[in-house]
């Protein structure tokens, strides 16, 4: 299917010829470079302006900058996803095959972002000898899924945009973690943000159910428009999100509201009996 233009607008980034592989790949590279730039700028600004950031160890600084970068991407993804979910008539007319030029822009730049995420996460794992299985799986499936959409000119955009809307939780996750490290876990603002974040994770679960509904009612269109490996990858990834990853993360975020501990960097063994410090870390007891 030929990508459909929004129409009625002057020349813009959305009016490019997205049937051109050169344009799509250039935007993917631009997405990678832009979010790498966000990561670097966050490091520079935080180093200059934030005392909490300067007190963190190297691995926590990487996580801080990644959280901020994900939050920026989350804003882009939320705007695009909500427009597709609630407004765009072309995508609603054919949820399996409908396309829009503005969607091509977001799909291509999202591919660059998810490639950046995979590079950053795996470099961090190698440097600090860590490994988060759920995070690695989530980012691998996201990158391969969006890469498939960039490559395939016939792929519909509704489900891809719905997938981007799953990133709506990232700004709240960023705020939660940064405030926790700054020692604000007892503040009303942190607790309110935590409630909103938990709500967003529940919304993620509802959104995955909606995506299954779309797959069920538009199955023939999906089979005819997607390559079989791409469709299989999407269904497996959606299944993991629905049954494992979303429930696990929702549980952990709810648990964190009741017990404000930075479980991303919990100490491997207790060093003393002191309570949680300003950065939200406590010695982890055996058996927890």
Swiss-Prot record:
It comes from the Eukaryota. It is found in: Endoplasmic reticulum membrane; Endoplasmic reticulum-Golgi intermediate compartment membrane; Endoplasmic reticulum. The chain crosses the membrane at residues 25-45, 71-91, 103-123, 131-151, 225-245. One of its GO terms (cellular component) is endoplasmic reticulum-Golgi intermediate compartment membrane. GO terms for molecular function: ceramide binding. Its main location: endoplasmic reticulum. GO terms for biological process: ceramide metabolic process; cholesterol metabolic process; lipid homeostasis; nervous system development; phospholipid metabolic process. Residues 62-262 form the TLC domain. Residues 269-288 are annotated as: Disordered. It is a multi-pass membrane protein. Keywords: Disease variant, Endoplasmic reticulum, Membrane, Neurodegeneration, Neuronal ceroid lipofuscinosis, Transmembrane, Transmembrane helix. PANTHER family: CT120 PROTEIN, PROTEIN CLN8. Interacts with CLN5. Interacts with CLN3. This is Protein CLN8. It comes from Canis lupus familiaris. The gene is CLN8.
């Amino acid at each position: 299917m030929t990508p459909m233009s929004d129409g009625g607008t002057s020349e813009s980034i959305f009016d490019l010829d997205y049937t051109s592989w050169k344009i799509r790949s250039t935007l993917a590279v631009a997405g990678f470079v832009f979010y790498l730039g966000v990561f670097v700028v966050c490091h520079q600004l935080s180093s200059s302006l934030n005392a909490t950031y300067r007190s963190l160890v190297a691995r926590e600084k990487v996580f801080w900058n990644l959280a901020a970068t994900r939050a920026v991407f989350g804003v882009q993804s939320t705007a695009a996803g909500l427009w597709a979910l609630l407004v765009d008539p072309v995508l609603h007319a054919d949820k399996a095959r409908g396309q829009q030029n503005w969607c091509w822009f977001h799909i291509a730049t999202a591919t660059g972002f998810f490639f950046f995420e995979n590079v950053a996460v795996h470099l961090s794992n190698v440097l600090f000898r860590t490994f988060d299985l759920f995070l690695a799986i989530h980012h691998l499936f996201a990158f391969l899924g969006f890469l498939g959409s960039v490559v395939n000119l016939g792929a519909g955009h509704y489900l891809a945009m719905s997938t981007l809307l799953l990133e709506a939780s990232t700004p709240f996750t960023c705020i939660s973690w940064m405030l926790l490290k700054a020692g604000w876990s007892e503040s009303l603002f942190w607790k309110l943000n935590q409630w909103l974040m938990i709500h967003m994770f529940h919304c993620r679960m509802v959104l995955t159910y909606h995506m299954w509904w779309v797959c069920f009612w538009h199955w023939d269109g999906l089979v005819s428009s997607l390559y079989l490996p791409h469709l299989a990858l999407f269904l497996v990834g959606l299944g993991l999100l629905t049954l494992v990853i979303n429930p696990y993360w929702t549980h952990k975020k709810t648990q964190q509201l009741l017990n404000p501990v930075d479980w991303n960097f919990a100490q491997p063994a207790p060093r003393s009996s002191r309570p949680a410090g300003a950065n939200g870390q406590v010695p982890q007891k055996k058996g927890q």
